[in-house]
């Protein structure tokens, strides 16, 4: 269920810049263990023993190197059992994890070969909280229909539109193009936005060369001046330095969304709908951030600050941009209400297994079945 449906946010912000700013480096580094936010569960009814499962584990992170995956049920950290009295602290500390060395005891659902799953126990390697290269591609794979080998579906889980991580996105799109995918399932459930330029580039890959000259978005600034961006190069020839998109040869898009999906992620959906490119949304209503910020930096008393005031809002080719209350999906996996009994997946957008397991990734299963014509 969506926390606080209809809640509004103030997006303008001021932050102090510590160390090297993102605008001064090409390779973006991040710290910590590489976990996403956690979901919790009781290990057994009537017991105080708890487990927490990460929403994702970033590629190339210390947590991945230690053997952890999305959905693994961590029940002990450095030998300390998680209980009702301490698990919340671990949910916060492991997500932020500014420093430290960790070993995890965890359970993993695995195919038992009999049409079901076994819950198997594992011990991780040592994970040292450390600086590592940030990769917003949380998962990428190609799903092939065993009954029709010509049907190939690219599945991309993308966390953030980060210009300095463009190489990771380009590599994934190149792999999809070389494999000749016939459909794309774009999972934006944990994507809160980022650079409009990269959103434009990915939208162009999906829309294809036949639509390059069409408007991807109209940017309307606070003084009512406007910029018309196109799918090919954005505002003007190669302004954003990303170049022409890679034409994936698609004629539709399946996109998975949640209440985390916002800003530049919502722009992909809006821009494609603006040119009547078929988009099917599965998941739950998006956040509803149809405004953007321009980042500037200043120094005061020897300290550097970044100012990010809201300076523009966006409209698509049809003039539509009124999604401040979010964009509603075509099919709800998890309803925007306080109930769990009417949800197809009552822990969405979280999971207790890895990305590719459709038994635990209902949104992916629905998209895949729509593509292949199989029964859900």
Q: Residue spans of the language-model regions?
A:
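Flexible, low-complexity junctional segments that flank or bridge functional domains
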Residues: 1-184, 198, 208, 376
């Amino acid at each position: 269920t969506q926390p606080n449906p209809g809640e509004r946010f103030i997006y303008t912000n001021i932050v102090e810049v510590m160390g090297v700013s993102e605008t001064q480096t090409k390779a973006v580094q991040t710290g910590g263990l590489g976990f996403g936010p956690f979901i919790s569960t009781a290990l057994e009814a009537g017991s105080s023993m708890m487990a927490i499962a990460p929403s994702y584990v970033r590629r190339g992170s210390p947590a991945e190197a230690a053997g952890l995956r999305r959905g693994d049920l961590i029940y002990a950290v450095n030998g300390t059992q998680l209980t009702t009295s301490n698990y919340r602290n671990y949910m916060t500390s492991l997500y932020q994890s500014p420093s430290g060395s960790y070993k995890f005891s965890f359970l993993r659902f695995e195919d038992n070969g009999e049409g079901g799953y076994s819950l198997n126990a594992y011990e991780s390697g040592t994970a040292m909280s450390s600086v590592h290269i940030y990769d917003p591609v949380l998962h990428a794979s190609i799903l092939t229909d065993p009954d029709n080998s010509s049907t190939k579906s690219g599945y991309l889980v993308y966390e953030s539109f980060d210009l300095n991580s463009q190489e990771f996105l380009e590599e994934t799109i190149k792999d999809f193009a070389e494999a000749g995918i016939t459909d794309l399932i774009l999972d934006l459930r944990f994507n809160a936005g980022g650079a409009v330029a990269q959103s434009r580039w990915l939208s162009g890959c999906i829309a294809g060369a036949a639509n390059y000259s069409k408007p991807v978005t109209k940017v309307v600034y606070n003084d009512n001046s406007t910029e018309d961006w196109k799918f090919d190069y954005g505002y003007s020839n190669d302004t954003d330095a990303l170049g022409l998109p890679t034409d994936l040869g698609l004629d539709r898009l399946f996109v998975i969304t949640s209440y985390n999906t916002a800003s530049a992620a919502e722009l992909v959906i809006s821009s494609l709908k603006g040119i009547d490119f078929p988009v099917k949304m599965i998941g739950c209503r998006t956040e509803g951030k149809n405004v953007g910020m321009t980042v500037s930096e200043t120094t005061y008393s020897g300290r550097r600050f970044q100012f990010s005031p809201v300076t523009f809002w966006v409209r698509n080719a049809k003039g539509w941009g009124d999604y401040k209350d979010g964009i509603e999906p075509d099919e709800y996996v998890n309803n925007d209400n306080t109930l769990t009994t009417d949800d197809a997946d009552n822990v969405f957008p979280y999971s207790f297994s890895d990305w590719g397991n459709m038994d635990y990734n209902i949104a992916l299963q629905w998209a895949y079945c729509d593509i292949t014509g199989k029964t859900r």
